[in-house]
A protein has these predicted regions:
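Long, highly charged, low-complexity intrinsically disordered interaction regions
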Residues: 2-108
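Charged catalytic cores and adjacent phosphate/nucleic-acid-binding surfaces used
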Residues: 2-12, 76, 87-115, 132-137, ...
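Single, functionally critical "micro-switch" positions that shape active/binding sites
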Residues: 70, 119, 150, 249, ...
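Ser/Thr-glycine-rich phosphate-binding loops at phosphate-binding pockets of nucleotides
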Residues: 119-124, 146-152
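Core AdoMet radical
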Residues: 148-149, 194-196
């Protein structure tokens, strides 16, 4: 079942911000055009940055489009919101995208309710569509107990991967956002992590001393996905056996649908890789993005038989995509994965202890 629309604030600025955020969230959740959605996220930043006097002046003059970053669509949302109305764009987004993401079985719904957190998400520091604070607020609103921010590592330049210096700077941002969340009375625990590239030789694409300071590390292959199995298998085994690896991300790299087209799964000795995951207590990610559905069903069964832990993650690149966990929960329920073997059902304290146990 879908949740009822949230009550909108009555204060004009708070109402405008809530409406802009909800339009963005619902379109992100439905994986609509990112460029169009970014306009609403940018408008949030603009409206939030206005002084009280500036906000009052633009409200009275209806001069929202004079502001850089406010276009006709976002101006209409703000105008209707400050007038106390439900904006037309918001009503349409609720109608079109506010329903259930998928039809879930009772077992799937039960497992979704057991998920405490999410260990794979991205912000605008790399290739995400929103700043960390917006991601954290959305995760809190969805009832998550914790969220790990795991922006990309430097090798992945196309995704604006973080250099060592930028990763250190992000640590300060995480601390600031943690304080902001506390000041807002939110209970979400924010974890600082990384999605670190597995390089061709199986090493991890970041300084080991920095990786060791993080709460969690998702190791993923993003390059040379068509590498022969004889080369891909030792590459993945080296990453899994590295004590810094917590989660093996989207292990086949496949794409089954979506705007980026399709991509076949990488070839590797799955029995050997999953045996190593089980031995090293590295979780196999069950990536919830519908275009990935990674691992495939037959590999989930193989990892389950091998005794692996799992991590159901959204791989969200925008706040609304944090809701994609439902797809992962249903796949895990269909596969019969016991909840206790899914690390994202564990409390944050247990997750951090597990991720640090091999350091």
């Amino acid at each position: 079942m879908s949740s009822p629309p949230p009550d909108l604030p009555t204060a004009p600025r708070a109402r405008a911000l809530a409406c802009l955020r909800e339009v963005a969230f619902l379109n992100e959740r439905a994986r609509q055009s990112s460029r169009r959605i970014e306009a609403y996220r940018n408008a949030v930043t603009v409206v939030e940055g206005l002084s009280e006097e500036e906000f009052a002046r633009h409200t009275e003059a209806d001069s929202w489009q004079e502001l850089r970053g406010i276009g006709s669509s976002t101006a209409a949302v703000v105008r209707e919101a400050v007038a106390g109305e439900v904006p037309t764009k918001l009503a349409a987004a609720r109608e079109e995208h506010g329903g259930p993401l998928l039809e879930m079985t009772p077992a799937g719904r039960e497992l979704l309710g057991l998920l405490a957190g999410d260990l794979h998400s991205h912000t605008s520091d790399s290739d995400g569509g929103a700043p960390l604070l917006e991601m954290a607020r959305a995760a809190d609103a969805l009832g998550r107990d914790y969220l790990a921010v795991t922006d990309h590592s430097p090798r992945l330049r196309v995704a604006n991967g973080l250099s060592a210096e930028r990763l250190v700077a992000q640590r300060d941002t995480v601390a600031q956002v943690r304080q902001q969340l506390a000041d807002e009375g939110r209970s979400l625990e924010l974890l600082h992590g990384i999605e670190v590239d597995v390089l061709d030789d199986g090493t991890l694409d970041q300084r080991e001393d920095l990786l060791a300071t993080l709460d969690v590390r998702v190791a993923s292959v993003h390059s040379k996905l068509r590498m022969p199995s004889a080369e891909m298998t030792p590459r993945m085994l080296a990453a899994v056996r590295n004590p810094l690896t917590s989660v093996l991300g989207h292990c086949t790299g496949r794409l089954v649908t979506g705007g980026r087209g399709t991509r076949p799964p990488s070839e590797f000795d799955a029995e050997a890789v999953f045996a190593a995951c089980a031995q090293e207590c590295v979780a196999v990610e069950l990536n919830a993005r519908p275009e990935r559905q990674d691992p495939p069903d037959e590999l989930i069964a193989l990892a389950l038989e091998a005794g692996c832990l799992f991590s159901i993650d959204s791989d969200a690149h925008a706040p609304g995509q944090l809701d994609l966990l439902a797809f992962g929960a249903q796949r895990a329920a269909d596969a019969g994965i016991p909840p206790e073997r899914i690390v994202t059902t564990w409390p944050a304290t247990q997750v951090k202890e597990w991720a640090a146990a091999r350091l």
